């Protein structure tokens, strides 16, 4: 579905085989994340030996897609779990590590796969369960990027890079760490509703902490609220006197042609926010088309055990401020 969606022309790689040449869905997702990481490192003009550490995660138990996928690269590894907010978690920790001087280059990556997510959290694919209209479709995709201590120079890179454009580059200039927000939702098939309160909290705190209004951002982009979650987010922010409708977009709504592709409320999964960020958003920031963006990946915190025991589904959302910085090198000179 992703390769036929609205963003198909922006992806670096589209694989027609959902198994990625592997024998299991889990191995397929590991291979996909490894490919994304390899692409990101190569586009930065680096090798795995140049990467000080990697922050990566996924939706599977014990984050096996990430650990198995990154293992062959030989990079010091931190495994993360933030559900579908994992890309925001990895970018936050990567930015902190770089700014603290713990590494010149940090790799951030995540992935999701429709089949592995269904197997992990819902029903076997052969069961053919009917999905409610509030449900989202897990994106089969992966995204990775390299955070550097120094501005990337497009003059020195062997080819184009989403982080180094002739007009400038994308930089992380601030973060708002998400809180676990429990609104008492129990419907795991309405994850947009579960995550919207967390997105509201993070966006509201970001605007307060940085003394900004929604208009100070060219776009506020949430991870995977979908149509249902977007409406709930607007209502919750309206109660706080904030209207972001003119600048809001959602990665879950950008990933598919919802009606034509029958994805109901939209897309979801770790790979949803990650693939939209790396394929579509970062190049637009690097080129200067977008000057300042608040990127807010959202996650629904649950497991098979917590759901079966009747626990509510909490949400979390991490805010990442991404800004366009003019290129440090003009006219082909560093």
Residue ranges and their predicted role:
Residues 34, 81-108, 147, 268-289:
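Active-site-proximal alpha-helical scaffold in enzymes
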Residues 56-57, 106-112, 147, 293-298:
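Short beta-strand segments
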Residues 63-64, 114-119, 180-184, 229, ...:
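Short, well-ordered, mixed-charge alpha-helical segments that flank or form enzyme active sites
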Residues 68-136:
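A generic, well-ordered mixed alpha/beta core segment in the N-terminal half of proteins
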């Amino acid at each position: 579905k992703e390769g036929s969606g609205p963003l198909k022309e922006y992806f670096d790689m589209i694989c027609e085989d959902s198994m990625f040449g592997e024998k299991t869905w889990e191995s397929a997702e590991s291979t996909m994340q490894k490919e994304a990481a390899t692409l990101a490192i190569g586009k930065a003009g680096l090798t795995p030996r140049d990467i000080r550490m990697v922050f990566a995660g996924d939706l599977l138990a014990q984050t096996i897609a990430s650990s198995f996928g990154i293992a062959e690269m030989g990079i010091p590894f931190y495994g993360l779990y933030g559900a579908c907010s994992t890309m925001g978690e990895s970018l936050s920790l990567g930015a902190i590590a770089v700014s603290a001087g713990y590494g010149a280059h940090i790799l951030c990556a995540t992935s999701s796969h429709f089949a592995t997510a269904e197997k992990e959290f819902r029903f076997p694919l052969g069961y053919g369960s009917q999905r409610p209209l509030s449900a989202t479709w897990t994106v089969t995709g992966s995204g990775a990027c390299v955070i550097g201590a120094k501005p990337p120079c497009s003059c020195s890179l062997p080819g184009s890079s989403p982080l180094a454009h002739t007009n400038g580059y994308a930089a992380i200039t601030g973060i708002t760490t998400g809180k676990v927000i429990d609104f008492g939702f129990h419907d795991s098939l309405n994850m947009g509703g579960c995550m919207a309160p967390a997105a509201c909290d993070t966006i509201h705190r970001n605007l307060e902490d940085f003394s900004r209004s929604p208009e100070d951002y060219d776009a506020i982009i949430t991870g995977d609220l979908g149509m249902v979650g977007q409406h709930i987010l607007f209502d919750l922010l309206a109660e706080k006197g904030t209207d972001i409708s003119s600048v809001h977009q959602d990665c879950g709504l950008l990933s598919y042609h919802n009606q034509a592709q029958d994805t109901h409320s939209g897309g979801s999964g770790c790979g949803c926010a990650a693939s939209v960020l790396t394929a579509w958003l970062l190049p637009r920031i690097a080129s200067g088309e977008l000057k300042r963006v608040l990127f807010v990946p959202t996650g629904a915190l649950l497991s098979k055990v917590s759901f079966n025991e009747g626990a509510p589904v909490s949400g979390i959302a991490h805010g990442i401020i991404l800004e366009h910085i003019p290129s440090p090198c003009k006219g082909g000179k560093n």
